[in-house]
Regions:
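Conserved mixed alpha/beta catalytic, RNA-binding, or beta-rich assembly cores of soluble enzyme
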Residues: 1-111
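C-terminal binding/interaction regions
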Residues: 108, 112-151
Length: 152
């Protein structure tokens, strides 16, 4: 708003917006951020799912919904032990992405898909990801037992 653009109201600044983030979640988010940065350098995707340091999925052309559905369908033998951390979905803008017209977006449907995939939460690059209906996202995260974290 300070610059005259209402879009900034949709781009949360850093902080935990719902739930609680553990040290394991912090480590998974750092790993996912590194993966997403690497994906961005070759213009592949804006998201990754990481659990206990293991990459379970990366976002590509089919998008976030398809990626999270794929994680939900993983057999238990291919998933890390949920007792040691459920993992997270991380989303960020690609390096060099035109932030005037092409920002990544999250919304309530993303949280529902993350919960269906058995994840512990959703983290995203603070100030660079549009959050549609943030009050509903916060409420829904609480209802679903997820954290929602704008990672700075």
């Amino acid at each position: 708003d300070a610059l005259g653009y209402a879009i900034y109201r949709l781009l949360p600044g850093p902080g935990v917006l719902a739930g609680a983030v553990t040290p394991r979640d912090e480590a998974d988010a750092a790993r996912a951020a590194a993966i997403v940065a690497a994906l961005g350098s070759v213009d592949v995707g804006q998201g990754a799912v990481v659990a206990q340091g293991l990459c379970l999925a990366v976002e590509a052309l089919p998008g976030t919904d398809a990626m999270l559905a794929g994680v939900a369908a993983l057999p238990s033998g291919l998933r890390p032990d949920s007792g040691r951390g459920r993992g997270l979905f991380y989303k960020a803008a690609k390096s060099g992405q035109d932030r005037r017209i092409d920002l990544p977006t999250l919304g309530p449907a993303t949280l529902r898909a993350a919960a269906a995939a058995g994840l512990g939460g959703v983290a995203f690059q603070a100030g660079s990801v549009i959050c549609l209906d943030l009050p509903e996202m916060k409420r829904l995260a609480g209802e679903l037992g997820l954290f929602l974290w704008a990672r700075g």
